[in-house]
């Protein structure tokens, strides 16, 4: 069985997944979409002279390091082309395209009736300012980043328009604004494989930092969420139809929960650090099972 692991050559999680697939007896090679080419009408997706359409499957761990909208879109299109050549891809490119775009992801959360923070998306600076004033405190997020990159906590003030304009220059329009959810210095990550919870962990903020991400100095800690919270996470993951995902949730001051994000690519490090759980072999087996039944949702 020949499998491509789409990700970052030398990257810890990418190489860990490739090793797990090899341990299951697969011939696994890491494929970097940054060096792939699509030739049409004939030729398909290739890395140099090596064409990929004869593979038995492709597992997507990362799209690469760039969060530029055009780059992300181009790499999703490479995966679409690979899938159309007959190679099953996990997770499916159409589902990844929704999850990597924060705007589309939020539309899906709302459509599914999942609890989420109040959100405003607009190209207009005046509308953005009005949203910040209404929220009191807002979080401004780029559409195509993860791990807290490019996020700002905003309040109304004389520098607000300048911050919005700089954000637009750096990340483009529209402005994506959410009501800030006051929290006790942590949020919850739930890893979901094939629609079922693998485990959960807290991301605990450093000091009084409002961001809990590891890039902001946060740390992982084991968590045992209630069955009700697990059900919310599993429902969110199933709605997106991803093979392996992480669902980020935040507890609200009234004791409820909201879904912040559904990740296109579930992470291994939180499960390993907080719970001592090596998820790579589990993901490898799930991917191989899916490739043996390509009609499986």
Q: Which residues make up each language-model segment?
A:
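Glycine-rich phosphate/pyrophosphate-binding beta-alpha loops
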Residues: 263-276
């Amino acid at each position: 069985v020949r499998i491509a692991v789409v990700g970052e050559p030398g990257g810890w999680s990418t190489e860990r997944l490739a090793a797990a697939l090899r341990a299951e007896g697969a011939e696994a090679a890491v494929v970097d979409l940054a060096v792939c080419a699509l030739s049409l009408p004939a030729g398909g997706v290739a890395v140099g002279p090596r064409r990929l359409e004869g593979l038995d499957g492709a597992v997507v761990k990362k799209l690469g390091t760039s969060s530029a909208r055009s780059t992300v879109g181009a790499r999703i299109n490479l995966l679409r082309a690979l899938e159309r050549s007959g190679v099953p891809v996990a997770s499916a490119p159409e589902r990844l395209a929704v999850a990597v775009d924060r705007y589309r992801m939020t539309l899906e959360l709302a459509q599914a009736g999942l609890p989420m923070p109040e959100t405003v998306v607009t190209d207009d600076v005046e509308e953005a300012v009005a949203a910040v004033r209404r929220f009191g405190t807002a979080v401004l997020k780029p559409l195509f980043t993860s791990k807290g990159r490019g996020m700002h906590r905003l309040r109304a003030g004389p520098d607000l328009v300048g911050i919005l304009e700089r954000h637009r220059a750096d990340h483009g329009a529209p402005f994506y604004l959410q009501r800030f959810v006051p929290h006790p210095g942590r949020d919850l990550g739930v890893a979901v494989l094939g629609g079922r919870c693998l485990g959960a962990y807290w991301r605990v903020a450093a000091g009084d930092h409002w961001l809990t991400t590891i890039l902001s100095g946060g740390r992982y800690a084991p968590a045992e969420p209630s069955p009700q919270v697990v059900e919310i996470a599993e429902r969110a993951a199933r709605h997106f139809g991803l093979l392996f995902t992480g669902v980020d949730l935040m507890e609200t001051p009234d004791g409820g929960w909201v879904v912040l994000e559904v990740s296109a690519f579930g992470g291994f490090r939180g499960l390993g650090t907080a719970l001592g759980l090596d998820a790579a072999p589990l993901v490898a087996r799930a991917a191989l099972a899916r490739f043996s039944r390509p009609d499986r949702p």
